[in-house]
Amino acid sequence: MNTPAVPAITDRRHLANGRVIPTESYSDQPYIVRTDDGAWLCCVTTGPGHEGVQGQHVTTLRSTDQGRTWSDPVPLEPGDQRENSYAVMLKVPSAPRLAGHVPRVDEEPGTPPAGRVYVFYNHNTDDVREIISHDGKQSIRRVDSLGHFVFKYSDDHGRSWSAARYDVPFRLFQCDRANVYGGRLCFFWNVGKPFILNGSAYVSLHKVGQMGRGFFQQSEGVLLKSDNLLTEPDPRRIRWETLPDGDIGLRTPPGGGPISEEHSYCVLSDGTVCCVYRSIDGHPVESCSRDGGHTWSEPRYRCFADGRRMKHPRAANFAWKCANGHYLYWFHNHGGKVMREAPGNADGGGYDDRNPVWLSAGIEIDTPGGREIAWSEPEIVLYESDPCVRISYPDLVEEGGRYYLTETQKDLARVHEVAADLLEGMWATLAAQLSRGKGPVANDDRRLLSLPLHGAAMPVTVPLPPLPWFRVRDHSVLDLRGKDTGEGVALELELTLPDGAPGRVLLDNRDGAGRGFCLRTAGAGALELMLNDGQTASHWISDPALDVGRPHHVVVNIDGGPRVISFVVDGRFLDGGETRQFGWGRFSPYLRHMNGAADLHIAPEVKDLRIFGRILRTFEAAMRAAAGSGRRASA
């Protein structure tokens, strides 16, 4: 019997090219710490069926070859059918005393073994089988986000775990006391990784005040701080404090919605703690603490370096500090007002559209209030061919100058190596924009066309080399099915529009049958790209970003991997602003190419033109825009 072949997808960003982390069925939160014996220790929530079913549990695995192979899973709670879920780990640094640690007079001599690993997780200790919604009208049988917050530890680099589990006590907040059980039963979970600051350990917790609409109906974030976890060998003597001060956790900005959850923390070079978390407001929320988590700045929506609000649905959005002192931020680059006001957003619609995954690069900057992080324009880092597949709950691992991301789409967990030149280009470009240094050199790799030629005028018509195909026949299988190539095309042009009229054709290679592409004005400062291979047509309209009479640098990317059309104007990625949920759009997975007539027609409004047989990364577009502005200024 022949087994159907699966076409190879060469694009490293595609999920299928990751290394699988073994799980039972459901897979969540594949988080990694590097142990002192050099292994990767991964904790993952798994189970026999869908998310939240009885028997859901945490396992750990070890890899000594960057996720190519894994040890047999070790369950934290062997044989326990009570839900134990949503684990995060913290490794005790090898140094016996951390900088900033001052021993208390009642602290006994001795330290935990070097490299001890703690794992924190939810445990349904009381075996609660059913709860009621906040309005009392609904019976809820999913019970994996309540009970006790507990930990175990390993002194053998994650090969085994302590037999005993230990409760982490936390203070009741206003939302706990106001829940349907008056705080006698608390709802919570955690996805945020622990961190260390001034000799103390901090563990995130997401409190849930109301269960019901959208499952979690009201939520906020707190920190559980231990001033002796890193130095106390006896887990029974570990002390805990709930932060922030008072009884209200990290919430949305004034006027925001009731959802503030999945908090992710970074410690800046001056000791500032920066937190980012999800909402149903269409934007990620951030807040900073400059006193070790006791008080926090008024929450605000996260912005790019130029002040534009970032957009994000109700999904995990995590930030990490890298070994070079810079940062990376995982988000999904859509949302805004349109999403916030969409029917069904609070009922669960906000959970959708976690594909593709975008990264923003961060660099610390000085502000009057202290250090903050400036964030770059976005880049696609991972995707799956089916837009409905959701990608989330990542972790970042660095080793030997290489970068790896873990992720899950709830069925499979994987590890992916990320192109280092992508990250370095993002950081370098942002640094140049912040006047910190010279940006990366322009890469003309796979440039197919560059006009006008030196000393010549822009031609009206020019022969156009063949453009890459997005989908071809797979000759390795008998049925010659189609396969995606992952190829892309970038149109880079400098132009000045004389008016705001729609329908002005700027670039056109269409033949008499309509095959090819056309870039034209769509009115009000927007551009429209039309693609046609003779049987399949796609189009996308940009945000209205072009001003009449002003020169603009435009990059249009036709990315055949995730099948995304995007526009970058004057170095800014167009994300839809407040008028659209998505600034980028998808073209048909069945569109094979955008080739048409032999010649390309160019409008006089186009002053410079380059066409590439690949996409231009956003940071490349930004640097090219800056170079074009410099040329115009010199002229």
For each predicted feature, which ranges?
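Beta-rich carbohydrate-recognition and catalytic domains
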Residues: 1-28, 33-82, 91-187, 195-262, ...
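Short tryptophan-centered beta-strand motifs in secreted/extracellular beta-sheet-rich domains
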Residues: 493, 550-558, 565-567
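Repeated scaffold domains used in trafficking and secretory/extracellular systems
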Residues: 84-88, 313-317, 392
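Flexible glycan-contacting loops in extracellular carbohydrate-active proteins
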Residues: 575-606
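Extracellular glycan-recognition modules
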Residues: 467-530, 564, 606, 611-624
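Low-complexity, glycine/proline/serine-rich flexible segments
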Residues: 436-487
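Short, aromatic/His-centered strand-loop micro-motif at the edge of beta-sheets
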Residues: 529-553
